[in-house]
Amino acid sequence: RVFVAGHRGMVGAACVRRLASEDCEILIATREDADLRRQDETEEWVRMAKPDVVIVAAATVGGILANSTRPAEFLYDNLVIESNLIEAAHKAGVAKLLFLGSSCIYPKLAEQPMREDALLTGPLEPTNEWYAIAKIAGIKLCQAYRRQHGSDFISAMPANLYGPGDNFDLQSSHVVPALIRKIDAAKQAGQATAEIWGSGKPKREFLHVDDLADALVYLLKFY
């Protein structure tokens, strides 16, 4: 029994698609079933559903503009969602939990290509530090439960994702869907150029969300 928290998001939906080919029962919870920002509702739902595995793909996400204009929402929502799910899984005796981190957890000036041991070695990228701080807290919370309780709670840090179910809203989208929409809009309007934010200097590594789902299933089985 695998509970995919955040099944409506791009990563969660990819996990549901991938798990459909596995010998498991997929569990999902809508906002009406449980508001994951509420500890009591989250713990009650997990206790009643009795999952063996929890995938924490639920999060408040967005691009540079969303991060910069809604910092409190990004920090608060993500802190409480991950904390509620991890504590609920612990209390319910869940056998394994997989928390989804993010590549933005690494320092802005981390050596390229980035290594896992670069975490917490320097200042974060200011444009998404609120989301990054919440993700770092989730990673450390899983480590703390492993150390204190022996819980099999692990974390995975995907690269920049794209694929089915992506967000194309220019106010909150990530770089790939934003580029696609801007270039398509320019082409449709017969414009010779399209405005792209940033300096063009940052290095990105992109990963299709279905490839991530394959990797996550592998981690659940063998890590």
Task: Map each language-model feature to its residues.
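Adenosine-cofactor binding site in Rossmann-like domains, unifying the SAM/SAH pocket
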Residues: 20-44
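N-terminal Rossmann NAD(P)H-binding glycine-rich loop of SDR-like oxidoreductase domains
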Residues: 1-21
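Flexible, glycine-rich beta-alpha linker
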Residues: 35, 105-107, 130, 154-178, ...
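Conserved Rossmann-fold NAD(P)-dependent oxidoreductase catalytic core, especially the SDR/UDP-sugar
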Residues: 83-128, 154
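NAD(P)H-binding glycine-rich loop region in Rossmannoid oxidoreductase-like domains
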Residues: 39-79, 88-91, 108
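Alpha-helical substrate-binding/gating segment
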Residues: 147, 161, 176-194, 204-223
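Active-site Tyr-X1-5-Lys
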Residues: 126-159, 175-189
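Conserved catalytic-site region of short-chain dehydrogenase/reductase
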Residues: 63-64, 99-114, 130-136, 147-148, ...
